[in-house]
Structures are given as C-alpha cells and as structure tokens.
Amino acid sequence: MKRIRDLWVRTNLIKKIGIGVVIGLLLGILLPDVTAIGILGQLFVGALKAIAPLLVFALVVQAISHQRSGQQTNITLIIVLYLLGTFLAALVAVIANYLFPLTLTLNTPVNTELSPPQGIVQVFQTLLLKLVDNPINALATANYIGVLAWALIFGLALKSVPSDFKHLIKTAADVTSQIVVWIINVAPIGIMGLVFSTVSENGISILSDYALLILVLVGTMLFVALVVNPLLAFALTHQNPYPLVFRCLKDSGLTAFFTRSSAANIPVNLQLCEDLGLSQATYLVSIPLGAMINMGGAAITINVLTLAAVNTFGIQIDFLTALLLSVVAAISACGASGVTGGSLLLIPVACSLFGISSDLAMQVVGVGFIVGVIQDSCETALNSSTDVLFTAIAENAFWKQKKA
C-alpha cells in the first residue's frame, strides 16, 4: 500500500488527471447507476467556486501593490506587445467561434432561465453596474467584474504603504494560492467524478464533443503562435520572424508544455534570452513580467469556452459584444498567472457578461478541467514562449529606432 501511495505522490499532475479521466470513463460505462461517484466532481467544482473570487482579489491586489515604476523605454514597448498579443489571441478565438461554433453538454435543464444581454449597450450597462458593486458582496456573490475593479483600486491604494504591510499582502496572496494548489492536487479525483457524471448521464458519444473542443483550442493556439505572433514580429523588425519563433517554441515552449507553469519556466526563458544576446537589464524585468500579464493562451481558453457556453444556451450576440468579450478576456487573462488552471477559474468573469450564472459558469470550468490535460500544456507553451519572442522583437525594434 505504501508503495502505491509513494508512486502516486511522485506521479505528476498531468498523468494523474489522465488516470482520473480514464477511470471516470470506465466507471461511467460499467457502473452508470452508482451516482455517488459523481458527488466527487460536485465537491471539486464547489471548492473551486468557493475559493475563486478570493483568489482573483488577492492576486490582483498583490500584483498591483508591488508593481514598480520607472521602467526602461523598451519595457514599455514589451508591455504593449504583451497586452496587444493577448487581445489579438482573444480576438482570434472569437473568429474561431464563428468558423467552428461549439456547444457543450452541461448538467442543466434546457429551460434554464438566463438573462442574455440585448446588444452592446446593455452589456456596458451591466458591466458598469457590476463595477460599483459592494466589494464584500462582489466576493460573496462571485461578481468577478466587481472583484477585479475593487482589487485594482485596493492595489493602487496600497502602493504607498510600508514594505512590511506589502509583505503581509503578498503572504495573504501566497496563502490563497496554496489553498488552490491543495484543491488542484485532488483534481484527478474530482475530474474522475465529472467524467463519470458526463458519461453515465450522456453516454460515450459525449467524448466526441470534447475532442472537437480540444481541436479548436489547440488549433487556435497554433494559429496565434505560427501566424499572428510572426506577423507582429515582422511588423516591428521587417525581418523573417520564423527562425526566432521556432527557437522560442523549441527552447521555451517545449519545457513549458510539460511544466504547465509560466513561473516555473522563467529560469529557462532567462537562459534563452542570454543565449540570444539580449540585454540583461531588459529581460530580467520583461520575463517575470510576461509570466504575469502575457496570457494569450489563457485569453483563447476563456473565449473559446465562454462562447461555447453562449452557443449552448442559445444566446445571440453581435460582433461588437464579442469584441468587448475579447477586451474582458484579455484583461481577465492577466489574472491567470501563477495559478494552475487559472484561466479556467476566470471563465465566470466572461460568462457573467452574458447573464450566465456562476453555477452554470462553474460547470463550464468543469468541462475545461476535463480537457485541461492538453489545453493547459498548450496554453502555457504559447504564453511562455511568447514572453521571449516579444522581448526579443521589442529590443530589436528599439535598437533599430535608436540607430535611425
């Protein structure tokens, strides 16, 4: 028994989740009437739902309050590239939804009452009202728009407090993140319950929907990595970007794929920047910063799954509303750094724009965790490799401008 326990502890989370998916699939086929197994999935989603608002608030407050000013000139360009790249990735995901519309099978009645927005004006009205929600109520009701807004305000207000108090804020954020790590560590069991419920209630054919979802997610990320990002690089450097793109994907993206952590991949990226001959003063700032705010892969995940939920509930949206979703997804994605499955936990932020309740949004998050074995690896590979890519092309453009 001890040998089995030690083997389980040594096995990485990706393999554990894969095992959970397989076991849940087999149990759903062989023992579909043992509904108690599905409770494990409900408990897992419930725990995530409980901690997610506090997690978003703590991380954003900590990041804003510790933000440093007076960065170098090309750091500004890198930040612009990070934000622009994240927005473009979100926009590509919206276009992918129009080309390959997806629907999800969720455990909710067909006649579930929703309050879909009536165009861009109502979306803005809803957004503004959620911005000024009571901060305690925003946390209690999972109003993520209000949580983000108040976290930004608190973070700015705390920038001038003594360093000891800032350390306390960081400790609170670290504690919250650790709780999430504990919850994520039982993800294989929770996902087993989710897969069991899905298969036992809907049959084995439901897996074909997940296969299509994975194809759209991974295909969109590949398009951004191999088309959108190279176009940005060419626009700034007027040089063939693909040698640099492939170097970043090989030396940074490959390791990030397996670590599934932009933060864990920072040492790899720093070494790659040194090998590329980039300015140390630049990449020592831009690489850790990119691990926090350069989240194109996360924006893709948020948009693809949110729009799949929108399609599932038959909510009609115009392109301007979808464009606003891209902005919200880009901003929300910046809060996904440093947390396993962070992009999935921010899906309710986007879903709330369309009147989709937190309960239903967390079911979408559950679907995300089922496909997360592949999605999270590809997402991290895109995010982390792009940190080096944008740092390199920004420095190249900066020195070309100085020489001119």
UniProtKB/Swiss-Prot annotation:
GO cellular component: plasma membrane
Subcellular localization(s) per the UniProt record: Cell membrane
Keyword Membrane: yes
One matching Pfam family: SDF
Transmembrane segments: 17-37, 44-64, 75-95, 138-158, 179-199, 212-232, 287-307, 319-339, 354-374
Keyword terms: Amino-acid transport, Cell membrane, Membrane, Symport, Transmembrane, Transmembrane helix, Transport
GO molecular function annotation: amino acid transmembrane transporter activity; symporter activity
This protein's record includes keyword Transport: yes
InterPro entries: Na-dicarboxylate_symporter (IPR001991), Na:dicarbo_symporter_sf (IPR036458), Ser_Thr_transp_SstT (IPR023025)
Main location: membrane
GO biological process, one term: serine transport
Protein topology in the membrane: Multi-pass membrane protein
Reactions performed catalytically: L-serine(in) + Na(+)(in) = L-serine(out) + Na(+)(out); L-threonine(in) + Na(+)(in) = L-threonine(out) + Na(+)(out)
SS bond partners: none
PANTHER family reported in the protein's UniProt record: PROTON/GLUTAMATE-ASPARTATE SYMPORTER (PTHR42865), PROTON_GLUTAMATE-ASPARTATE SYMPORTER (PTHR42865:SF7)
Function: Involved in the import of serine and threonine into the cell, with the concomitant import of sodium (symport system).
Family: Belongs to the dicarboxylate/amino acid:cation symporter (DAACS) (TC 2.A.23) family.
Name of this protein: Serine/threonine transporter SstT
